């Protein structure tokens, strides 16, 4: 197959037979259609386009658009960006103030930058522009109603139909769902959730004197509800102030944000934006594909369960989804497509899945003993060094716990249950799951 041998050769379709090529051109069958132009979707579109495939990126909003997000860019996020990407930092963090529900405040500092802070509209827009420069085509203001893998809209078993609001149908050899935590593509795949949290956030413009006090420093406050915490992220003349806690604690979460803002002395400043957002974390056995459809980022429930950090998970899973979508687009039958989808699941679970597994244990331990976490980060150099290494990208939470006996013992003492992989069970179980995902292709709506 010349297309497989030369991934830089852009073709109308992954199938190079003359008859199919002419038909594809007439019906405009895309190699890869990506739904959602956030960090996960833009990364997937970039990865597929840079491989020479014909890629369409769909986004329901007009860009740029606001997203509820702290906007912290840690090392793993930076390392997953396209070559030449210049981060639009609003601030660079060298100090962290920790507090335990407003008490026992202590600030720790680092000579090297810990992480950077961005505004999502700028960041997302730049990611999309990189995907476009790589060859992806963007359509905004379109809403996907459903995807179909058989039926009258689908010309053959190698094609997926993406049905838009209004009835237009787009055909593709592979589809990547990156349409966020309320994903319609996720519903089609059958994504199952294990943890749902509510994040509330306010963008608060402040005078220059207040902004100067926060420059280069963030605040992390361990909250009053189990597993909750708050943050202040400075971005020039605006402070991003937010809190997050388990869903079902809506009134208490709102009260926490109000108390938090009041304690900070910011109650007198009017927010320019107040917003809320649900973060959703996948169950261990949640599928990552169905037929020729993959999911990534929030649509797949991929985020770090303890901190609920999602940007690095979106960028990394999006890149993998784009790379494996290219292989699925090239697959000539269901068996090969199934094999490629299974490989994508293995790639996700071997990396991000391990981090999620450790993150779940960290969250359980944090829910029980937030004061101990606070004491460690503010009083023990190894704990602070671990925080620095993770945020700077020198290691990950999974690598840290698995590679350092002291960290293993500490986590085992806090959470004595045996470690479970985030869906990294026996290969036989995964193969069976992949077969079910592939063989039950069809239509789902939400």
Over which residues does each language-model region extend?
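Intrinsically disordered, low-complexity terminal tails and inter-domain linkers enriched
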Residues: 1-27, 150-157, 331-334, 420-444
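A conserved beta-strand/loop capping segment in the N-terminal third of enzymes
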Residues: 77-126
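Beta1/beta-strand and adjacent pyrophosphate-binding region of the FAD-binding site
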Residues: 24-40
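C-terminal helical "tail/cap" subdomain of flavin- and related membrane-associated enzymes
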Residues: 326-430, 435-446
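Conserved N-terminal glycine-rich FAD pyrophosphate-binding loop of Rossmann-like flavoproteins
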Residues: 61-84
